[in-house]
């Protein structure tokens, strides 16, 4: 029992206590309601959207958000359209892409921080940034993946991808049921659109994104190619 929902999967955080937040609680509610099934939930391309006006950051509101999401999961399940699927209707297509690293990242500076052994190197994400640059220099590519199941397509995208990528994917194949899972390979961190890097904001700022505005052209092309494969 798969479900997909695009939003930042957070209500309140930085408590030092691990928890699945409201999407995990909603998934557990569905497990209780349908014990014979295993609910598996994916967060969609929710890099630049959140619970918005429905979330005031209060601990009490986490349950309310979980109940709303669980209700959406229930209604989606009850309105499932079933179709027979043969082995030939199942596909797994991979499109490796080289996402452009952000220009503000300097490998020499990050290497120097590593050599000095500063505690903040790992705590502030510099270790992840250095690993990303090393991967890029080595020619490592990120796999963009599409699972085909009959008339359904499920895309798996890297990082905290902006919702525009999900909307573009659905618009590219209105004849199919298209679902999107984000938060895959997290090396890029936030993945914005080209214009978003011009507009500013936290998500596309140097502390938050490891890729540049050219990422939109690369990722959109991969999405279109994957969705056009097959019937």
Region spans (language model):
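Non-catalytic substrate/cofactor recognition surfaces at enzyme active-site rims
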Residues: 1-231
């Amino acid at each position: 029992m798969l479900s997909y929902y695009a939003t930042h999967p957070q209500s309140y955080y930085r408590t030092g206590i691990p928890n699945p937040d409201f999407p995990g609680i909603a998934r557990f509610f569905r497990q209780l309601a349908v014990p014979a099934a295993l609910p598996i939930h994916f967060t969609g391309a929710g890099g630049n959207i959140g619970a918005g006006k429905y979330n005031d950051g209060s601990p009490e509101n986490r349950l309310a958000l979980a109940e709303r999401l669980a209700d959406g999961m229930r209604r989606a399940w009850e309105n499932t359209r079933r179709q027979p699927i043969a082995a030939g209707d199942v596909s797994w297509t991979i499109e490796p892409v080289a996402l452009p690293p952000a220009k503000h990242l300097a490998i020499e500076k990050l290497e120097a921080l590593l050599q000095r052994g500063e505690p903040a190197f790992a705590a502030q994400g510099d270790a992840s940034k250095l690993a990303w640059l090393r991967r890029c220099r080595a020619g490592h590519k990120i796999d963009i993946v599409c699972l085909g199941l009959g008339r359904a397509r499920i895309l798996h995208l890297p990082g905290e991808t902006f919702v525009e990528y999900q909307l573009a994917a659905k618009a590219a194949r209105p004849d199919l049921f298209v679902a999107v899972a984000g938060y895959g390979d997290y090396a890029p961190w936030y993945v914005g659109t080209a214009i978003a890097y011009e507009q500013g904001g936290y998500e596309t700022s140097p502390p938050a994104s490891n890729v540049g505005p050219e990422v939109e052209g690369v990722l959109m092309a991969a999405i279109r190619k994957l969705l056009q494969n097959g019937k």
